[in-house]
């Protein structure tokens, strides 16, 4: 949602040094896990959405952020993906699962499968590659409304 990637939201490590404790996280290029892993390679994609969808998406993210202590990282669901199974837990997400959930709640049309993986976002209608390379070297130019980072 932030073309400068100063605010990125997802479900991942709560502590950059401990991969086993996860939940809702707010990160940036120089904050959190990406600060620790300075050589992270990334691809930033965008899709066009309406102002109304953008506002809904913002509301959804901020609602989850305000109640983040109620949410957990869906470790079981993430492991299940590797086994081609879907295990959905209440108030628990892995990264791609959260993006799909937020898009659905914001009424952003998508063709994502039930068992969603980061590479599935490449099949979104009208997706556009904005940047590929080292995250620390990312510089914003003119990006559309919604960025799906780190696919």
Go through the PLM ranges and name each one.
Residues 4, 15-18, 30, 39, ...:
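Detector for Asparagine
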Residues 30, 35-39, 48-78:
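A structural motif
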Residues 1-47, 78-87:
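Glycine-rich catalytic cores of cysteine/serine-nucleophile enzymes that process amide/ester linkages
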Residues 46-49, 131:
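Surface-exposed beta-strand edges and flanking loops
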């Amino acid at each position: 949602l932030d073309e400068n990637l100063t605010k990125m939201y997802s479900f991942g490590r709560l502590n950059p040094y401990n991969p086993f404790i996860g939940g809702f996280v707010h990160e940036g290029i120089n904050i959190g896990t990406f600060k620790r892993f300075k050589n992270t390679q990334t691809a930033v994609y965008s899709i066009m959405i309406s102002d109304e969808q953008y506002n809904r998406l913002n509301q959804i993210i901020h609602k989850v952020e305000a109640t983040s202590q109620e949410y957990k990282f869906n470790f079981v669901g993430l492991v299940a993906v590797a086994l081609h199974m879907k295990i959905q837990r209440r108030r628990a997400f892995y990264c791609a699962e959260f993006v799909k959930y937020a898009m659905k709640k914001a009424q952003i049309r998508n063709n994502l499968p039930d068992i969603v993986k980061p590479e599935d976002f490449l099949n979104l209608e009208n997706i556009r590659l904005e940047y590929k390379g080292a995250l620390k070297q990312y510089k914003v130019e003119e990006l559309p409304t919604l960025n799906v980072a780190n696919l």
